[in-house]
């Protein structure tokens, strides 16, 4: 959705949020009657197209400042955690659900956990874990080939979720759950789906009814939390026992839990923090990565010329490994994934057009200014990611699916970048594209998500 050119005040006098344009609303409830949690991003994007890059909306008693101008959005992201923190409801909800980890942590808790989780998910560790991704990708390929041979309909979205659950469980605690081997719904996946939906519902609720009048759905969510929580605690206990018996695992961790437990005593995470971080990884990887891959496939299906070029790239990457390994439909060397620039561009273009986290909500901690507007502490600020990423000032043909825009060669020809740049888009466009966030709290799972997506697409296309 394209938004109009921004109307940013040039006067030196700051205005208050109450003076911002916006959709108005009814007494007491504001625009709550128009609010649908599952469509929140579309509703807010529609208002951004009408009212510009900064506006105010009231939902019930709560006013929210909504921004979609890249530099202001980056200001919010870069000033975390001192200047802005997640929505004030996030940590209480995550803590009571036993999910309090890096995602919900703030201040000193976040500073202590961040380097540990980042190290566990960095390219060096993922290179050691890459065979796990290869195995899961081979299983997905075999499942789809068998379905094709038998003429069985494939539920692509469900299988991609199984795939990401399998990869995440193996990476997180060395357990091969192999949900891809099942045709019926997997119990673990069902519990994770219920928890994921429960988080979204509770964070979007204006009244915490689950605390004093729990519904049947609330009780089912709590049951799923207990079941998965008990399993995760068992994995933690087992990982500790393994490391006591095999000290080498401190230097050569076999999965994420080993890497987290290898921290020295001064940095060590509590069981609750370990539990929260492992649960967060399970939930984050299950939904976001699978949706990105599904959107990429959907967009490719409507562009046969791009599909053909991507297929050629995948076949060439597999052929380059032919001399070092047996013929395989799956890339077996992590370095080979670097030879997939167009496929990576397809993933990035899917994230640009269909971001899996299209908005983020924050609470101001300190007084600041955004686009000439005074932001007081405790002000709720929402950033919208799709409007700037589909703005013609940042991306040519912004509504078109053009993965080649991310390639350095086209950027040089179009004047958007240079042939020597690692990304084919200009600096301004890169600032407008933030699917993994930005600033100090840049998503630690970015590399893993891109790696999984490239592996699945390369295998499927070849």
Language model: regions and residue ranges:
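Conserved cytochrome P450 catalytic core segment spanning the I/J/K helices
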Residues: 27, 33, 122, 224-293, ...
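Cytochrome P450 heme-binding Cys-pocket and its upstream "meander" loop
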Residues: 33, 38-46, 86-87, 267-276, ...
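Cytochrome P450 I-helix active-site segment
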Residues: 18-25, 130-134, 187-194, 245-257, ...
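Conserved cytochrome P450 K-helix E-x-x-R motif and the immediately C-terminal K′/meander segment
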Residues: 31-52, 230, 234, 329-371, ...
């Amino acid at each position: 959705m394209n938004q109009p050119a921004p109307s940013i005040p040039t006067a030196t006098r700051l205005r208050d949020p109450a003076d911002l344009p916006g959709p108005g609303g009814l007494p007491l409830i504001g625009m709550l009657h128009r609010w649908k949690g599952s469509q929140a991003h579309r509703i807010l994007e529609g208002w951004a197209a009408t009212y510009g890059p900064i506006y105010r909306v009231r939902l019930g008693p709560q006013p929210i400042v909504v921004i979609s101008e890249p530099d202001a959005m980056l200001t919010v992201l870069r000033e975390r955690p001192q200047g802005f923190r997640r929505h004030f409801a996030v940590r209480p909800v995550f803590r009571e659900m036993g999910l309090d980890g890096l995602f919900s942590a703030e201040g000193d808790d976040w500073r202590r956990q961040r380097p540990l989780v980042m190290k566990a998910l960095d390219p060096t560790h993922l290179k050691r874990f890459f065979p796990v991704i290869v195995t899961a990708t081979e299983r997905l390929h075999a499942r789809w080939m068998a379905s094709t041979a038998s003429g069985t309909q494939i539920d692509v979205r469900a299988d991609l979720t199984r795939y990401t659950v399998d990869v995440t469980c193996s990476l997180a605690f060395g357990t091969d759950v192999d949900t891809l081997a099942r045709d019926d719904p997997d119990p673990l996946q069902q519990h994770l789906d219920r928890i994921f939906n429960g988080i979204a519902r509770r964070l979007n609720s204006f009244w915490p009814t689950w605390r004093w009048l729990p519904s049947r759905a609330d009780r089912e969510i709590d049951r799923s939390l207990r079941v998965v929580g008990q399993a995760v605690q068992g994995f933690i206990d087992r990982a500790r026992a393994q490391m006591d018996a095999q000290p080498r695992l401190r230097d050569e961790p076999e999965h994420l839990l080993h890497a987290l437990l290898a921290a020295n005593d001064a940095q060590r995470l509590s069981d609750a923090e370990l539990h929260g971080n492992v649960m967060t990884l399970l939930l984050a990887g299950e939904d976001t990565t699978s949706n990105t891959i599904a959107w990429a496939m959907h967009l490719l299906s409507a562009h046969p010329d791009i599909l053909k070029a991507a297929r050629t790239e995948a076949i060439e990457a597999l052929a380059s490994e032919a001399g070092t390994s047996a013929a395989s439909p799956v890339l077996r060397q992590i370095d080979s994934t670097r030879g997939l620039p167009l496929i990576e561009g397809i993933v990035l273009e899917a994230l640009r057009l269909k971001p899996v986290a299209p908005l983020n909500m924050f609470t101001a901690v300190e007084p600041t200014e955004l686009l000439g507007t005074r932001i007081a502490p405790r002000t709720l600020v929402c950033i919208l990611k799709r409007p700037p990423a589909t703005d013609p000032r940042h991306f040519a043909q912004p509504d078109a699916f053009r993965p080649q825009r991310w390639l350095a060669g086209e950027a040089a020809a179009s004047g958007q970048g240079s042939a020597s740049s690692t990304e084919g888009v200009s600096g301004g466009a890169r600032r407008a594209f933030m699917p993994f966030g930005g600033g100090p709290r840049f998503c630690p799972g970015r590399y893993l998500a891109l790696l999984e997506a490239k592996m699945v697409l390369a295998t499927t296309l070849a």
